[in-house]
Amino acid sequence: MGSKSQQQVQVTPSASAAILVVMYIAAFVAAFNENIINVALHDIMAAFLVSAITAQWLVSGYMIVTSIFTAIMAFLSGRFSTRKLLFFACGCMVAGEVLCLIAPSFSVLLPSRILQAAGSGILFPLMMNVVLSCAPREKLGLYLSLGGACITLGP
């Protein structure tokens, strides 16, 4: 009945702490990526000679794709292991960031940003799943709150 991602894995307290720190950092970076583009929109419009409406798709597209991937995480977590999802999400984010960095045109920048969003959409709920798996039951509220704080403080 339980999938790979739902099974309780026994790890040492130090390994749990390391896993949680990695997940918190990943969630912080994902949240930071979500909003960092806002301060650069004017420069992007000038560099790529696009209108404000077109440039705004960097923000809107990111939010839409993040929402979609967050919504389908229940399906994905039932099909793939937490490790595979984490590597896929981080891979999407890193690949998207590198492609955004070297994007020669807006038509390359937008899909690169969408790739980042796919990673973020997976990372947010994945972090909560990992916290539920790794955190001690008596301190679950604290660890879930820390995860939420990382997402909130990212921007």
Stretches with model-predicted labels:
Residues 2-155:
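Transmembrane-helix bundle of Major Facilitator Superfamily
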